[in-house]
């Protein structure tokens, strides 16, 4: 049974010994984009493609050791590549550029997985750096944590700068480092004040809330 309510669809299926394959497309942009995101492959075909893709990623590092040690090592490498998530084309505000979401969170990954990805998956890391700069251009600040197209509530810090510095030190090309420097200087010098200025909150509280969102608290005191 299927029912459509206000552009939403749900279905109730009663199955016994029948094997059912369901294809689902999801999009943050539109229903049309969701339809495009429905995978045309069969389950077995997609499984084969995924195995091939992951083998290509994981085979960039070869180690020796026991089967247990290898399993632990490659499981760790696999986990480093799960987040941030490539959602290019799925941000309704700037869908034409590389876009990564679910940075959780850069104050941990700038010193662990991101320097590793710079070495073993340069294209992905380049896209992530460019995504940080795209977020700066559209939202005003680079995030320290981000999910659901929104900079998350964070502890203080500007760790995206360290990610960019690592890319620059390793000679990564394809990044607008002049724009990156502009973003870094703003992070270091300009306290965020993007909470609605017409709200009933006083300016100090609005500044505190904005700083919490962007992880930019205490800049005035730090720079004084």
Where are these regions (language model features)?
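Acidic/polar, glycine-enriched structural segments that form the non-catalytic walls/loops
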Residues: 1-102, 134, 173-189
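Aromatic-rich carbohydrate-recognition surfaces in CAZymes
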Residues: 105-109, 113-224
């Amino acid at each position: 049974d299927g029912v459509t309510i206000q552009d939403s669809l749900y279905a109730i299926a009663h199955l016994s010994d029948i094997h059912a394959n369901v294809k689902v497309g999801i999009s943050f942009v539109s229903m049309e984009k969701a339809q495009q995101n429905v995978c045309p492959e069969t389950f077995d075909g997609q499984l084969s493609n995924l195995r091939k893709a992951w083998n290509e990623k994981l085979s960039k590092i070869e180690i020796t050791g026991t089967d247990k040690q290898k399993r632990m090592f490659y499981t760790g490498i696999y986990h480093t590549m799960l987040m941030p998530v490539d959602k290019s084309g799925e941000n309704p505000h700037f869908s034409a550029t590389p876009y990564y979401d679910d940075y959780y969170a850069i104050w941990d990954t700038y010193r662990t997985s991101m320097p590793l990805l710079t070495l073993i998956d340069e294209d992905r890391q380049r896209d992530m750096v460019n995504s940080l700069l795209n977020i700066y251009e559209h939202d005003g600040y680079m995030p320290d944590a981000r999910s659901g197209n929104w900079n998350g509530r964070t502890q203080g810090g500007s760790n995206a700068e360290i990610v960019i510095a690592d890319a620059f030190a390793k000679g990564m090309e394809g990044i607008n480092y002049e724009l990156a420097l502009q973003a870094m200087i703003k992070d270091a010098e300009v306290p965020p004040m993007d909470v609605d200025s017409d709200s009933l909150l006083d300016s100090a509280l609005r500044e505190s809330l904005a700083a919490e969102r962007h992880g930019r608290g205490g800049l005035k005191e730090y720079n004084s």
